[in-house]
């Protein structure tokens, strides 16, 4: 067997194992989703697939913590490394990414607030809302706009299917500009799905802080560079 053939065999086995793992996880989530009841006042947050406490999910979470109309809400943050994120408010729980507790949170929460694609098998029920914040302006081609060969783990067709499947479950998607809106519609196949109207061209919540600053904060930032 040549080196190229060996590499192809290893890649095939990895893909097979990944599909098996995802099938097991998918079956578990389906059972949880069928068993759990939706809690309208529970919100789950995830940023960059659990890698950080950041971006628009963080901005929305911190706004909701201060807003009196959400005083009786409870929250769940999904992290890959829970220990590195310190303490949160009493009304907030931390769960590990890709864990049973994380899937249970998604199965129960009335609202999901995320800035990157979720696992394919995590799908909301009719009484759940999935708010996709995304994480920037797609200046490079992503999703269904990709034309060149795929990456090391996915073909072009697989990437397009993944983005289309993601779009099918999104309730609302945030955009920061008309340019961004058109790119997101195209990348997520929203026009073909008849879902262009899910785009909310409000600007990214993470940018609100740039317009709501104080002189004291400006000076503090300047001092940090000295």
Q: Model-found features: residue ranges?
A:
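N-terminal pre-catalytic "stem/leader" segment of glycosyltransferase-like enzymes
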Residues: 2-101
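Glycine-rich nucleotide phosphate-binding loop and flanking beta-alpha elements
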Residues: 51, 113, 119-120, 180-182
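A nucleotide-sugar donor-handling region in carbohydrate enzymes
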Residues: 12-26, 140-143, 148-149, 154-226
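Receiver (REC) domain switch-region micro-motif
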Residues: 43, 112, 173
């Amino acid at each position: 067997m040549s080196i190229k053939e060996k590499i192809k065999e290893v890649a095939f086995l990895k893909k097979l194992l990944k599909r098996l793992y995802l099938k097991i996880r998918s079956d578990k989530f389906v059972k949880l989703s069928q068993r759990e009841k939706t809690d309208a006042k529970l919100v789950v947050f995830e940023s960059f697939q659990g890698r950080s406490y950041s971006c628009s999910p963080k901005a929305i979470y911190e706004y909701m913590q201060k807003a009196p109309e959400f005083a009786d809400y409870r929250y769940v943050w999904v992290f890959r490394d829970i220990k590195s994120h310190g303490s949160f408010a009493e009304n907030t729980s931390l769960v590990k990414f890709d864990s049973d507790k994380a899937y249970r949170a998604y199965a129960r929460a009335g609202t999901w607030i995320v800035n990157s694609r979720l696992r394919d098998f995590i799908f909301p029920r009719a009484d759940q809302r999935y708010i996709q914040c995304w994480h920037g302006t797609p200046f490079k081609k992503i999703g269904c706009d990709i034309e060149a060969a795929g990456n090391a783990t996915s073909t072009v067709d697989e990437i397009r299917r993944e983005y289309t499947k993601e779009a099918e479950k999104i309730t609302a998607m945030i955009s920061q500009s008309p340019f961004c809106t058109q790119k997101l519609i195209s990348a997520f196949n929203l026009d073909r799905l008849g879902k262009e109207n899910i785009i909310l061209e409000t600007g990214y919540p993470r940018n609100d802080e740039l317009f709501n600053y104080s002189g004291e904060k400006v000076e503090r930032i300047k001092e940090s560079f000295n």
